[in-house]
Amino acid sequence: MSCPEQIVQLMHMHLDGDILPKDEHVLNEHLETCEKCRKHFYEMEKSIALVRSTSHVEAPADFTANVMAKLPKEKKRASVKRWFRTHPVIAAAAVFIILMGGGFFNSWHNDHNFSVSKQPNLVVHNHTVTVPEGETVKGDVTVKNGKLIIKGKIDGDVTVVNGEKYMASAGQVTGQIEEINQLFDWTWYKMKSAGKSVLDAFNPNGEE
């Protein structure tokens, strides 16, 4: 078409319903004298009428479901990989719990050896550990698979793992007392110990 660009713009304005009366008059005069523009305008009107006539057509209710059913099934491994990529923190925590929980489970069932912390004024006989009356034991005391009898003073925490604790009337503990006789308690204790070791490694001088 060699007609002015303005005429094409007026066609679009007319089809959009935005044309002014004076501009519509200009367009009509041109269409009466220009066969090419008149044919082009007629084709545009037919196209718009066709689109409007099909605007009420809707896809069947089950169209989406049918299309999805015909698509290739995603491999289960791929969906698992996608879940791990979108939930990295949860995945890491789950793996940590599985690995650490399994290790703690084996440790709990296989470790039956008696052990005790190494303070010099603890009295150890067979599997019995005694804090003598009048003695003050400095630091945390841990007894595994044995018995702890407290007659004196412990200046720290007490942890008895899979054992027994007796405190005489004169016995004293300045810190916390924890008795661990269940697998869950053991797991929690080991996790706390590991966390404490990490903190100590980053803060060797005990600074806050």
UniProtKB/Swiss-Prot annotation:
GO CC terms in record: plasma membrane
Localisation: Cell membrane
Induction entry: By different stresses causing damage to the cell envelope, such as alkaline shock, salt shock, phage infection and certain antibiotics that affect cell wall biosynthesis.
Key words of the record: Cell membrane, Membrane, Metal-binding, Stress response, Transcription, Transcription regulation, Transmembrane, Transmembrane helix, Zinc
Main location as per UniProt: membrane
Mutation effect (residue 146 to S): No longer requires PrsW for degradation
Cytoplasmic face residues: 1-87
InterPro entries, A to Z: Anti_sigma_zinc_sf, Znf_put
Oligomer status and interactors: Forms a heterodimer with cognate sigma factor SigW, which probably prevents SigW from binding to DNA.
Name of the protein this chain belongs to: Anti-sigma-W factor RsiW
Name of encoding gene: rsiW
